[in-house]
Amino acid sequence: MWDDQAMYVSVLTREYPPTIYGGAGVHVAQLVPQLRTLIDVDVQCMGQPREGATAHAENYPEGANGALRAFGADLSMVDAIPDEVDLVHSHTWYTNLAGLLAGVFHDVPHVISAHSLEPDRPWKAEQLGGGYRLSSWAEKTAYDAADAVIAVSEGMRADVLRAYPELDPDKVHVVRNGVNTDEFHPVTETDVCRDIGMDP
């Protein structure tokens, strides 16, 4: 498929540095630099312009429910993804619809990373009304059509198959979150522990 040229992946995410507020954002922020050491990576995110990614404002349709505005950003992402990509990889319901549409539009596989699931957040129905119905629909539709789903744990894999029992279990793979050992490693210094009153 790629001969001697690097694979080209478009990562679709709502969160990307410097705007990160949850685990999926941390995951993508750690994943992309590692992927870029191996392959070519395009990043499409939501929000304000930033270095290393193409950002899409969540402002259309103006004044609409947040889910509709996320879909507006999704459509903008699909249009901005380079024609040369070999695969699209979406994270969370915010970009799962973009991944589905981009896969169809560019005729490439769509892979989803499962961080959380809308069916496991029923309280959002009361908070978001129709927006929750839309986010749930987008997630289910994207999962049903995805070429592969990556669960970040065995527990998440079980949750995906429980929430979406029609999925082929062979399409749902576990790839645990990695750890950057340059950043996270054992230390022998105890100054910080003492400074906060903790017995090292």
Question: Predicted regions span which residues?
Answer:
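Histidine-centered beta-alpha loop that forms part of the nucleotide-sugar donor binding/catalytic region
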Residues: R14, A114-L117, R176-N177
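Short His-centered aromatic/hydrophobic patch
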Residues: S90-T95, A114
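A short, charged, and often flexible helix/loop element on the N-terminal side
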Residues: R50-I81, E126-Q127
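Nucleotide-sugar donor phosphate/pyrophosphate-binding loop at the beta->alpha transition
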Residues: V108-V111, P119-T141
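A short helix/loop element that forms part of the nucleotide-sugar donor recognition site in Leloir-type
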Residues: H185-M198
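Short beta-strand scaffold positions
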Residues: S90, A151-V152
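N-terminal subdomain of nucleotide-sugar transferases
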Residues: M1-E51
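Carbohydrate-associated surface elements
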Residues: G155, G178
